[in-house]
Protein backbone atom coordinates (compact mmCIF):
# COMPACT_ATOMS: atom_id res chain seq x y z
CA UNK A 1 0.00 0.00 0.00
CA UNK A 2 1.50 3.37 -1.00
CA UNK A 3 1.85 5.89 1.78
CA UNK A 4 0.98 8.50 2.79
CA UNK A 5 -2.62 7.73 1.87
CA UNK A 6 -6.19 8.78 2.52
CA UNK A 7 -8.27 5.64 3.09
CA UNK A 8 -12.05 5.68 2.54
CA UNK A 9 -13.71 2.77 4.32
CA UNK A 10 -16.66 1.53 2.27
CA UNK A 11 -18.48 0.05 5.26
CA UNK A 12 -18.46 3.37 7.12
CA UNK A 13 -19.42 5.30 3.98
CA UNK A 14 -22.43 3.04 3.40
CA UNK A 15 -23.42 3.43 7.05
CA UNK A 16 -23.61 7.20 6.60
CA UNK A 17 -25.41 6.93 3.29
CA UNK A 18 -28.02 4.57 4.73
CA UNK A 19 -28.70 6.92 7.64
CA UNK A 20 -29.04 9.92 5.32
CA UNK A 21 -31.34 8.04 2.95
CA UNK A 22 -33.47 7.02 5.94
CA UNK A 23 -33.79 10.62 7.11
CA UNK A 24 -34.79 11.74 3.61
CA UNK A 25 -37.50 9.08 3.40
CA UNK A 26 -38.95 9.67 6.88
CA UNK A 27 -38.87 13.46 6.62
CA UNK A 28 -40.05 13.53 2.98
CA UNK A 29 -37.15 15.72 1.90
CA UNK A 30 -34.34 15.46 -0.61
CA UNK A 31 -30.80 15.24 0.76
CA UNK A 32 -28.05 15.84 -1.78
CA UNK A 33 -24.24 15.74 -1.65
CA UNK A 34 -22.29 19.02 -1.54
CA UNK A 35 -19.17 18.58 -3.64
CA UNK A 36 -17.33 21.29 -1.72
CA UNK A 37 -16.79 18.74 1.07
CA UNK A 38 -16.33 15.53 -0.92
CA UNK A 39 -16.06 14.93 -4.67
CA UNK A 40 -14.15 11.68 -5.21
CA UNK A 41 -16.03 10.62 -8.31
CA UNK A 42 -14.84 7.00 -8.33
CA UNK A 43 -17.08 6.48 -5.29
CA UNK A 44 -20.18 7.86 -7.04
CA UNK A 45 -21.55 4.42 -8.01
CA UNK A 46 -21.95 3.76 -4.27
CA UNK A 47 -23.59 7.15 -3.67
CA UNK A 48 -26.09 6.59 -6.48
CA UNK A 49 -27.50 3.62 -4.57
CA UNK A 50 -28.70 6.05 -1.88
CA UNK A 51 -29.13 9.56 -3.34
CA UNK A 52 -30.06 10.98 -6.73
CA UNK A 53 -28.56 14.49 -6.87
CA UNK A 54 -25.62 16.66 -5.90
CA UNK A 55 -24.89 20.34 -5.42
CA UNK A 56 -22.25 22.36 -7.25
CA UNK A 57 -20.75 25.82 -6.86
CA UNK A 58 -18.66 26.10 -10.01
CA UNK A 59 -18.53 24.97 -13.62
CA UNK A 60 -16.09 22.19 -12.71
CA UNK A 61 -18.38 20.83 -9.99
CA UNK A 62 -21.45 21.14 -12.22
CA UNK A 63 -19.72 19.18 -14.98
CA UNK A 64 -18.63 16.55 -12.48
CA UNK A 65 -22.23 16.15 -11.35
CA UNK A 66 -23.53 15.89 -14.89
CA UNK A 67 -20.77 13.75 -16.38
CA UNK A 68 -19.72 11.49 -13.49
CA UNK A 69 -22.65 11.43 -11.06
CA UNK A 70 -25.03 11.15 -13.98
CA UNK A 71 -27.53 13.82 -12.96
CA UNK A 72 -27.70 17.60 -13.42
CA UNK A 73 -26.58 19.62 -10.42
CA UNK A 74 -28.32 21.94 -8.00
CA UNK A 75 -25.96 24.83 -8.66
CA UNK A 76 -25.24 27.93 -6.60
CA UNK A 77 -22.32 30.32 -7.07
CA UNK A 78 -21.49 33.60 -5.34
CA UNK A 79 -20.99 35.09 -8.81
CA UNK A 80 -21.51 33.63 -12.28
CA UNK A 81 -19.47 34.85 -15.24
CA UNK A 82 -20.42 35.39 -18.87
CA UNK A 83 -17.81 32.91 -20.04
CA UNK A 84 -19.08 29.99 -17.93
CA UNK A 85 -22.77 30.63 -17.39
CA UNK A 86 -24.28 28.87 -20.40
CA UNK A 87 -22.29 25.70 -19.80
CA UNK A 88 -23.24 25.73 -16.12
CA UNK A 89 -26.92 25.94 -17.12
CA UNK A 90 -26.49 22.95 -19.43
CA UNK A 91 -25.22 20.88 -16.48
CA UNK A 92 -27.83 22.02 -13.94
CA UNK A 93 -31.43 21.27 -12.96
CA UNK A 94 -31.61 24.04 -10.34
CA UNK A 95 -29.68 27.29 -10.41
CA UNK A 96 -29.54 29.73 -7.50
CA UNK A 97 -28.47 33.35 -7.81
CA UNK A 98 -26.63 35.04 -4.95
CA UNK A 99 -27.98 38.53 -5.60
CA UNK A 100 -30.78 40.32 -7.42
CA UNK A 101 -28.23 41.93 -9.73
CA UNK A 102 -26.90 38.51 -10.77
CA UNK A 103 -30.48 37.36 -11.32
CA UNK A 104 -31.26 40.38 -13.50
CA UNK A 105 -28.10 39.89 -15.51
CA UNK A 106 -28.45 36.18 -16.25
CA UNK A 107 -31.96 34.84 -15.67
CA UNK A 108 -33.02 35.15 -19.31
CA UNK A 109 -30.21 32.74 -20.20
CA UNK A 110 -31.36 30.12 -17.67
CA UNK A 111 -34.20 28.56 -19.64
CA UNK A 112 -35.01 25.00 -18.65
CA UNK A 113 -33.71 25.16 -15.08
CA UNK A 114 -35.52 25.92 -11.83
CA UNK A 115 -34.28 29.31 -10.66
CA UNK A 116 -33.66 30.13 -7.02
CA UNK A 117 -32.42 33.07 -4.98
CA UNK A 118 -30.12 32.87 -1.99
CA UNK A 119 -31.50 34.68 1.03
CA UNK A 120 -29.77 35.77 4.23
CA UNK A 121 -31.78 35.44 7.47
CA UNK A 122 -29.08 37.43 9.30
CA UNK A 123 -28.79 34.67 11.88
CA UNK A 124 -26.20 31.95 12.32
CA UNK A 125 -24.73 30.23 15.36
CA UNK A 126 -21.43 29.39 13.66
CA UNK A 127 -18.79 30.70 16.05
CA UNK A 128 -15.81 30.79 13.69
CA UNK A 129 -16.15 33.85 11.45
CA UNK A 130 -14.22 32.15 8.65
CA UNK A 131 -17.12 29.69 8.34
CA UNK A 132 -20.05 31.95 9.25
CA UNK A 133 -22.05 32.71 6.08
CA UNK A 134 -24.32 35.22 7.84
CA UNK A 135 -21.69 37.35 9.60
CA UNK A 136 -22.11 41.14 9.27
CA UNK A 137 -20.84 42.27 5.89
CA UNK A 138 -21.32 38.84 4.34
CA UNK A 139 -21.26 38.60 0.56
CA UNK A 140 -23.84 35.79 0.61
CA UNK A 141 -27.54 36.21 -0.10
CA UNK A 142 -30.29 38.82 -0.10
CA UNK A 143 -31.78 40.13 3.14
CA UNK A 144 -35.55 40.38 3.56
CA UNK A 145 -35.57 44.18 3.44
CA UNK A 146 -34.15 44.07 -0.11
CA UNK A 147 -36.71 41.65 -1.57
CA UNK A 148 -39.69 42.94 -3.57
CA UNK A 149 -43.14 42.07 -2.24
CA UNK A 150 -43.82 40.11 -5.40
CA UNK A 151 -40.93 37.98 -6.61
CA UNK A 152 -40.08 37.76 -10.30
CA UNK A 153 -42.30 35.05 -11.75
CA UNK A 154 -39.44 32.73 -12.73
CA UNK A 155 -37.97 32.51 -9.21
CA UNK A 156 -39.07 29.11 -7.98
CA UNK A 157 -37.10 28.68 -4.76
CA UNK A 158 -35.07 30.11 -1.90
CA UNK A 159 -31.66 28.88 -0.84
CA UNK A 160 -30.44 29.55 2.70
CA UNK A 161 -27.15 28.32 4.19
CA UNK A 162 -26.48 29.10 7.87
CA UNK A 163 -24.76 26.07 9.42
CA UNK A 164 -21.37 24.40 9.85
CA UNK A 165 -21.29 20.90 11.39
CA UNK A 166 -24.35 21.93 13.40
CA UNK A 167 -26.93 19.98 15.38
CA UNK A 168 -30.69 19.71 14.92
CA UNK A 169 -31.23 22.09 17.85
CA UNK A 170 -29.32 24.79 15.99
CA UNK A 171 -31.39 24.13 12.88
CA UNK A 172 -34.58 24.45 14.91
CA UNK A 173 -33.59 27.89 16.19
CA UNK A 174 -32.38 28.97 12.76
CA UNK A 175 -35.55 27.75 11.08
CA UNK A 176 -37.60 30.02 13.33
CA UNK A 177 -35.59 33.01 12.09
CA UNK A 178 -35.94 31.93 8.46
CA UNK A 179 -39.70 31.63 8.77
CA UNK A 180 -39.98 34.94 10.60
CA UNK A 181 -38.02 36.73 7.88
CA UNK A 182 -39.19 34.99 4.72
CA UNK A 183 -42.42 33.01 5.23
CA UNK A 184 -44.53 35.69 3.54
CA UNK A 185 -42.81 34.83 0.25
CA UNK A 186 -43.26 31.05 0.61
CA UNK A 187 -46.63 30.99 -1.24
CA UNK A 188 -44.75 32.25 -4.32
CA UNK A 189 -42.22 29.39 -4.21
CA UNK A 190 -42.03 25.72 -5.15
CA UNK A 191 -38.95 24.68 -3.15
CA UNK A 192 -36.61 25.75 -0.37
CA UNK A 193 -33.03 24.61 0.11
CA UNK A 194 -31.76 24.84 3.69
CA UNK A 195 -28.14 24.41 2.63
CA UNK A 196 -25.46 22.35 4.30
CA UNK A 197 -23.86 21.99 7.71
CA UNK A 198 -26.46 19.49 8.98
CA UNK A 199 -24.14 16.93 10.58
CA UNK A 200 -26.76 14.20 10.90
CA UNK A 201 -24.23 11.33 10.93
CA UNK A 202 -22.45 12.54 14.06
CA UNK A 203 -23.15 10.25 17.02
CA UNK A 204 -24.78 12.93 19.17
CA UNK A 205 -26.93 14.40 16.38
CA UNK A 206 -30.65 14.26 17.19
CA UNK A 207 -31.92 12.68 13.98
CA UNK A 208 -35.48 12.28 15.25
CA UNK A 209 -35.60 15.99 16.06
CA UNK A 210 -34.59 16.83 12.51
CA UNK A 211 -37.29 14.54 11.13
CA UNK A 212 -39.93 16.14 13.37
CA UNK A 213 -38.78 19.61 12.31
CA UNK A 214 -39.18 18.76 8.65
CA UNK A 215 -42.52 17.03 9.17
CA UNK A 216 -43.79 20.11 10.98
CA UNK A 217 -42.49 22.36 8.22
CA UNK A 218 -44.37 20.25 5.65
CA UNK A 219 -47.57 20.63 7.65
CA UNK A 220 -47.23 24.41 7.58
CA UNK A 221 -46.10 24.65 3.94
CA UNK A 222 -47.22 21.45 2.19
CA UNK A 223 -46.52 22.78 -1.32
CA UNK A 224 -42.81 23.40 -0.68
CA UNK A 225 -40.25 20.77 -1.62
CA UNK A 226 -37.45 20.77 0.98
CA UNK A 227 -33.80 20.17 0.11
CA UNK A 228 -30.78 19.76 2.41
CA UNK A 229 -27.26 19.67 0.98
CA UNK A 230 -24.78 18.54 3.64
CA UNK A 231 -21.20 17.75 2.77
CA UNK A 232 -19.35 16.54 5.85
CA UNK A 233 -22.28 14.35 6.93
CA UNK A 234 -21.71 12.02 4.00
CA UNK A 235 -18.00 11.45 4.65
CA UNK A 236 -17.98 11.93 8.45
CA UNK A 237 -15.71 9.43 10.22
CA UNK A 238 -15.26 7.36 7.05
CA UNK A 239 -11.49 7.01 7.09
CA UNK A 240 -8.04 8.29 8.06
CA UNK A 241 -4.96 9.86 6.58
CA UNK A 242 -2.03 7.50 7.18
CA UNK A 243 1.36 9.21 7.52
CA UNK A 244 4.82 8.23 8.74
CA UNK A 245 7.49 9.77 10.96
CA UNK A 246 10.49 10.77 8.84
CA UNK A 247 12.52 12.66 11.46
CA UNK A 248 12.42 13.81 15.07
CA UNK A 249 13.99 17.13 16.04
CA UNK A 250 14.22 19.05 19.32
CA UNK A 251 14.52 22.75 20.14
CA UNK A 252 14.11 24.47 23.51
CA UNK A 253 12.71 21.30 25.01
CA UNK A 254 10.08 20.86 22.29
CA UNK A 255 10.26 17.65 20.32
CA UNK A 256 8.75 17.65 16.85
CA UNK A 257 8.02 14.53 14.85
CA UNK A 258 8.27 15.56 11.21
CA UNK A 259 5.88 13.60 9.01
CA UNK A 260 5.58 12.81 5.32
CA UNK A 261 2.37 14.86 5.15
CA UNK A 262 1.60 18.54 5.61
CA UNK A 263 -1.10 20.32 7.60
CA UNK A 264 -0.89 23.21 5.14
CA UNK A 265 -1.16 21.04 2.04
CA UNK A 266 -3.17 18.00 3.13
CA UNK A 267 -5.19 19.01 6.23
CA UNK A 268 -5.80 22.74 5.67
CA UNK A 269 -8.92 22.98 7.85
CA UNK A 270 -6.78 22.11 10.89
CA UNK A 271 -4.96 25.42 10.50
CA UNK A 272 -7.88 27.46 9.13
CA UNK A 273 -10.49 26.57 11.77
CA UNK A 274 -8.26 25.82 13.69
CA UNK A 275 -8.87 22.43 15.27
CA UNK A 276 -6.74 19.56 16.52
CA UNK A 277 -7.36 16.34 14.61
CA UNK A 278 -7.63 13.07 16.47
CA UNK A 279 -4.46 10.98 16.21
CA UNK A 280 -4.85 7.28 16.78
CA UNK A 281 -3.13 6.16 19.98
CA UNK A 282 -2.36 9.70 21.14
CA UNK A 283 -3.93 12.28 23.42
CA UNK A 284 -4.29 15.93 22.48
CA UNK A 285 -2.60 18.10 25.11
CA UNK A 286 -3.92 21.62 25.62
CA UNK A 287 -1.35 24.44 25.48
CA UNK A 288 -1.35 25.03 29.26
CA UNK A 289 -0.99 21.33 30.01
CA UNK A 290 1.74 21.06 27.41
CA UNK A 291 3.71 23.87 29.08
CA UNK A 292 3.40 22.13 32.44
CA UNK A 293 4.62 18.86 30.97
CA UNK A 294 7.66 20.61 29.52
CA UNK A 295 8.45 22.49 32.74
CA UNK A 296 11.62 21.37 34.56
CA UNK A 297 9.57 21.30 37.79
CA UNK A 298 6.91 18.99 36.38
CA UNK A 299 6.81 15.47 37.80
CA UNK A 300 5.77 14.39 34.31
CA UNK A 301 8.82 15.95 32.64
CA UNK A 302 10.82 12.98 31.40
CA UNK A 303 11.40 11.05 28.19
CA UNK A 304 8.55 8.78 29.30
CA UNK A 305 6.06 11.64 28.79
CA UNK A 306 6.32 10.96 25.04
CA UNK A 307 5.10 14.44 24.19
CA UNK A 308 5.43 15.55 20.56
CA UNK A 309 4.55 18.40 18.31
CA UNK A 310 3.67 17.07 14.84
CA UNK A 311 5.29 18.90 11.94
CA UNK A 312 4.50 18.93 8.25
CA UNK A 313 7.03 18.45 5.49
CA UNK A 314 6.60 21.81 3.77
CA UNK A 315 8.86 24.82 4.30
CA UNK A 316 6.09 26.93 5.83
CA UNK A 317 7.16 27.83 9.37
CA UNK A 318 3.63 27.39 10.70
CA UNK A 319 3.12 23.94 9.17
CA UNK A 320 2.84 22.19 12.53
CA UNK A 321 0.36 21.48 15.31
CA UNK A 322 0.66 20.19 18.80
CA UNK A 323 1.10 18.82 21.24
CA UNK A 324 0.11 15.16 21.38
CA UNK A 325 1.11 12.67 24.05
CA UNK A 326 1.78 9.12 22.89
CA UNK A 327 2.09 6.01 25.06
CA UNK A 328 5.53 5.21 23.64
CA UNK A 329 8.58 6.79 22.08
CA UNK A 330 7.98 7.49 18.40
CA UNK A 331 10.35 5.80 16.00
CA UNK A 332 11.50 6.70 12.50
CA UNK A 333 9.19 5.13 9.93
CA UNK A 334 6.36 4.64 12.42
CA UNK A 335 2.79 5.23 11.28
CA UNK A 336 0.92 8.27 12.54
CA UNK A 337 -2.78 7.99 11.72
CA UNK A 338 -5.01 11.06 11.57
CA UNK A 339 -8.65 10.04 12.03
CA UNK A 340 -11.63 11.40 10.08
CA UNK A 341 -9.71 12.89 7.16
CA UNK A 342 -12.01 12.26 4.19
CA UNK A 343 -14.20 15.40 4.19
CA UNK A 344 -12.78 18.82 3.32
CA UNK A 345 -9.36 17.34 2.60
CA UNK A 346 -8.98 15.95 -0.93
CA UNK A 347 -11.16 18.81 -2.24
CA UNK A 348 -8.81 21.39 -0.66
CA UNK A 349 -5.33 19.88 -0.90
CA UNK A 350 -2.59 21.62 -2.84
CA UNK A 351 0.94 21.05 -4.06
CA UNK A 352 2.57 24.02 -2.36
CA UNK A 353 6.33 23.60 -2.20
CA UNK A 354 6.04 20.58 -4.52
CA UNK A 355 5.19 18.45 -1.50
CA UNK A 356 4.10 14.95 -2.51
CA UNK A 357 0.34 14.45 -2.43
CA UNK A 358 -0.98 11.43 -0.50
CA UNK A 359 -2.51 8.62 -2.51
CA UNK A 360 -6.23 7.91 -2.22
CA UNK A 361 -7.53 4.42 -1.54
CA UNK A 362 -10.75 2.62 -0.69
CA UNK A 363 -10.96 -0.22 1.80
CA UNK A 364 -13.82 -2.33 0.50
CA UNK A 365 -16.22 -4.28 2.67
CA UNK A 366 -14.47 -7.52 1.72
CA UNK A 367 -11.20 -6.20 3.17
CA UNK A 368 -9.52 -5.53 -0.17
CA UNK A 369 -7.75 -2.23 -0.70
CA UNK A 370 -8.28 -0.44 -4.02
CA UNK A 371 -5.96 2.43 -4.92
CA UNK A 372 -8.15 5.09 -6.51
CA UNK A 373 -5.41 7.61 -7.28
CA UNK A 374 -1.68 8.11 -6.95
CA UNK A 375 0.07 11.43 -7.52
CA UNK A 376 3.49 12.20 -8.93
CA UNK A 377 5.77 14.79 -10.47
CA UNK A 378 3.56 15.13 -13.56
CA UNK A 379 0.67 16.37 -11.40
CA UNK A 380 2.86 19.11 -9.94
CA UNK A 381 4.46 20.03 -13.27
CA UNK A 382 1.13 20.23 -15.11
CA UNK A 383 -0.23 22.68 -12.51
CA UNK A 384 2.73 24.95 -13.25
CA UNK A 385 2.16 25.09 -17.04
Where are these regions (language model features)?
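N-terminal capping/small domains of soluble enzymes
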Residues: 1-69, 262, 326-339, 343-345
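Conserved, mostly hydrophobic/aromatic
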Residues: 13, 36, 65, 117, ...
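Active-site-proximal beta-alpha core segment in soluble small-molecule metabolic enzymes
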Residues: 29-191, 205, 213-216
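Structured core elements
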Residues: 96, 116-118, 159, 193, ...
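Feature marks short, surface-exposed loop/turn motifs that line or immediately flank catalytic pockets
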Residues: 123-125, 164, 200, 234, ...
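Glycine-rich beta-strand-to-loop/alpha-helix junction loops that act as flexible
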Residues: 161-163, 192-201, 230-233
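Short glycine/threonine-rich loop-to-helix capping motif typified by GTGT followed
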Residues: 167-173, 201-210, 237-243, 247, ...
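Charged (often Lys/Glu-rich) extended helix/loop segments that serve as interaction or gating elements
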Residues: 230-294, 299-385
